[in-house]
């Protein structure tokens, strides 16, 4: 399959998923709370792509949720290109993806994160994953979440779940705190074996996130919470901020490739405490 077609298929999927997720989130919130939509361009003078980020705040269910789509292209800086595969002969790149972060009003509902992307240099690969960060311990929820992820992974390859769970546990870890960010999930990168199969898996991950996040909200949002619970949530969000600013690859990639700063930092919660 031609790389142009692969790019178009991947980009269209990410954009469609953004539309679907935002529509469902607004339906949950009701008529009063809507996404604020911002379009952006990577360059003011050259055609280097851009994207659209959507942020909804102060809802009855969501304190803040961001859903970002991007398609950017151009050249890596000499400093950054050495960190990216496929750039020995050329610094040109193309990248598209979707990123979602949900910070909930009810402290019993965990923060949820998902992203998938397709990056092309001299060759193309997929990356992404999803994870959940509760501020209240709930072993039943944790077991259910991982069983759902395993089911999704097993549809494509029986080895995926164990491997991608391990990568997620290793990735979402704060070494300076010596603690994990949350209860894990799956995380994968440099996926470039069979394009059709890889793209099918990437779509599966997106659909799974939609279904899992809906189910978690349905289960947990009914629970009553206190001011003390909210304070616990604020402190847990502090850990979220630390990880995203110090260790997150997506944040570093976006900032070092001229991405939109507001879109990149949309993952940060509206309020956090230390």
Regions found by a protein language model. Give the residues of each.
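Compact, glycine/acidic-enriched structural inserts
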Residues: 122-166
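Internal mixed beta-strand/loop scaffold within catalytic domains of large alpha/beta enzymes
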Residues: 51-128
């Amino acid at each position: 399959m031609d790389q142009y077609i692969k790019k178009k298929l991947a980009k269209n999927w990410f954009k469609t998923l953004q539309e679907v997720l935002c529509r469902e989130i607004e339906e949950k919130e009701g008529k009063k709370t809507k996404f604020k939509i911002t379009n952006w361009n990577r360059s003011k003078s050259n055609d280097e792509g851009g994207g659209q980020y959507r942020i909804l705040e102060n809802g009855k269910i969501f304190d803040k949720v961001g859903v970002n789509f991007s398609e950017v292209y151009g050249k890596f800086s000499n400093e950054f290109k050495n960190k990216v595969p496929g750039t020995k002969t050329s610094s040109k790149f193309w990248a598209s993806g979707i990123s979602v972060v949900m910070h909930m009003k009810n402290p019993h509902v965990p923060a949820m994160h998902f992203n998938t992307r397709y990056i092309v240099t001299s060759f193309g690969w997929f990356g992404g994953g999803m994870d959940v960060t509760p501020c209240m311990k709930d072993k039943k929820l944790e077991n259910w979440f991982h069983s759902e992820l395993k089911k999704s992974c097993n549809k494509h390859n029986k080895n995926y779940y164990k491997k991608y769970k391990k990568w997620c546990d290793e990735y979402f870890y704060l070494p300076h705190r010596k603690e994990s960010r949350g209860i894990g999930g799956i995380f994968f990168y440099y996926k470039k074996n069979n394009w059709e199969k890889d793209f099918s898996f990437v779509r599966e991950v997106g659909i799974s996130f939609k279904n899992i996040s809906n189910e978690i909200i349905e289960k947990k949002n009914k629970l009553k919470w206190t001011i003390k619970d909210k304070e616990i949530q604020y402190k847990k969000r502090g850990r979220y901020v630390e990880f995203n600013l110090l260790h997150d690859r997506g944040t570093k990639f976006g900032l070092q490739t001229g991405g939109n700063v507001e879109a990149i930092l949309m993952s940060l919660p509206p309020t956090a405490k230390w």
